[in-house]
Structures are given as structure tokens and as C-alpha cells.
């Protein structure tokens, strides 16, 4: 059995295929994720699994250099924003973009996976930009 944190085969595969500057997104239950090979649906019921738990686990296995968040999270979900900031290194650049741009980036060619959680708080979506480990 796999020893590292992520047991889901689709998330493991997405992370294994990521190169420098590639993206992986983690999203709330309401994000309109395209129904293609990049969709990884973990949602079981409302708030299961939670966005922040999935993010924490992914960060154990993925080296990131930058994150993208919806500008709207500042006003509509400051608690989630604070939790995200607690999880990431202060060296990681945070870029705020309009939520509509977050949605359009789900189909970006550099995006290797779109994880859907059961999260039901607004604007709980993040794009992780990969870094190298050397």
C-alpha cells in the first residue's frame, strides 16, 4: 500500500505528471468544472471532504511557487483565506484574480487536474502553480 499522504489514484497521477509552471486546482462543490479527463470529483456530501483538508494533503506532495485565488475571497470568505495563508509558506506568491478568470483557467492547457471537494463556503477555489524540487 502507498505510504505517502495521497491515496486517491487520480490525484496521485495528476501530481506525478506535473512539471514546472503546471497547475492543479482544488475547488468548492459549486465550481463549474469541465467534465473531462482532468476532473477529479471527491465530493461526497456538503463539506465532505473540506477544501482546506484536501489542500493541506496536496501541499504535502506538491512543490508550489505561486497560488491563484479569486479576488472575491477577501470580502466573501476571509476565514478561508486566513486558513490558506496559514498552510502556505510566506515565500509563496499569492495572486488574486477575478472569479470569472478562475473559472476560465479550469480548461487551461497547463492545468493537469481539477479537484472538486464537498466545500460549500464561497470562493473556496485555488490554483497551485508548480515549482521544481531542485
From Swiss-Prot:
Pathway: Carbohydrate metabolism; D-ribose degradation; D-ribose 5-phosphate from beta-D-ribopyranose: step 1/2. GO terms for cellular component: cytosol. It comes from the Bacteria. Pfam families: RbsD_FucU (PF05025). Substrate binds at residues 28, 99, 123-125. The keyword Glycoprotein does not apply. SUPFAM superfamilies: RbsD-like. The keyword Cell inner membrane does not apply. It is found in: Cytoplasm. One of its GO terms (biological process) is D-ribose catabolic process. InterPro entries: D-ribose_pyranase, RbsD-like_sf, RbsD_FucU. It catalyses: beta-D-ribopyranose = beta-D-ribofuranose. The active site is at residue 20. Keywords: Carbohydrate metabolism, Cytoplasm, Isomerase. Its EC number is 5.4.99.62. PANTHER family: D-RIBOSE PYRANASE. Belongs to the RbsD / FucU family. RbsD subfamily. Catalyzes the interconversion of beta-pyran and beta-furan forms of D-ribose. Homodecamer. This is D-ribose pyranase. It comes from Staphylococcus aureus (strain USA300 / TCH1516).
